[in-house]
Amino acid sequence: MAKQKIRIRLKAYDHRVIDQSAEKIVETAKRSGADVSGPIPLPTEKSVYTIIRAVHMYKDSREQFEQRTHKRLIDIVNPTPKTVDALMGLNLPSGVDIEIKL
């Protein structure tokens, strides 16, 4: 029989929030009796935006903004029905994007 696996990808702009969420997920999965691999930190996406400070002229005066997207990967191997129920009832912060693949 093939092993079942749940793959959870987390994305957030704040690394503290994503680490707390990952720890909650890992703790919940381990408590329910599943094997957990992770959280694995994936490369951080960095988007840099450059704008001109003045409205009409002074092209040499520019300002740069950046937006970092932190990502984590968690694999849950051999999940039990209890694991799935516990993960569905888990409350996570609103700043975390969760993508689950079975």
Curated annotation (Swiss-Prot):
According to its UniProt entry, one GO biological process term is: translation
Keyword Ribonucleoprotein included in the entry's annotation: yes
Is the Ribonucleoprotein keyword given for this protein? yes
User: Which Pfam families is this protein grouped with?
Assistant: Ribosomal_S10
Record-linked Gene3D superfamilies: Ribosomal protein S10 domain
Among the GO molecular function terms of this UniProt record, one is:
tRNA binding
Name the SMART domains on file: Ribosomal_S10
Q: Which keywords are on file for this protein?
A: Ribonucleoprotein, Ribosomal protein
**Record's GO cellular component terms:** ribonucleoprotein complex; ribosome
Q: Which InterPro entries match?
A: Ribosomal_uS10, Ribosomal_uS10_CS, Ribosomal_uS10_dom, Ribosomal_uS10_dom_sf
Q: Which PANTHER family match?
A: 30S RIBOSOMAL PROTEIN S10 FAMILY MEMBER
**Described function:** Involved in the binding of tRNA to the ribosomes.
What NCBIfam families does this protein map onto?
PRK00596.1, rpsJ_bact
Which family does this protein fall into? Belongs to the universal ribosomal protein uS10 family.
Quaternary arrangement and interactors, per the entry? Part of the 30S ribosomal subunit.
**What protein does this entry describe?**
Small ribosomal subunit protein uS10
The organism's lineage is: Bacteria, Bacillati, Bacillota, Bacilli, Bacillales
| Gene behind this protein | rpsJ
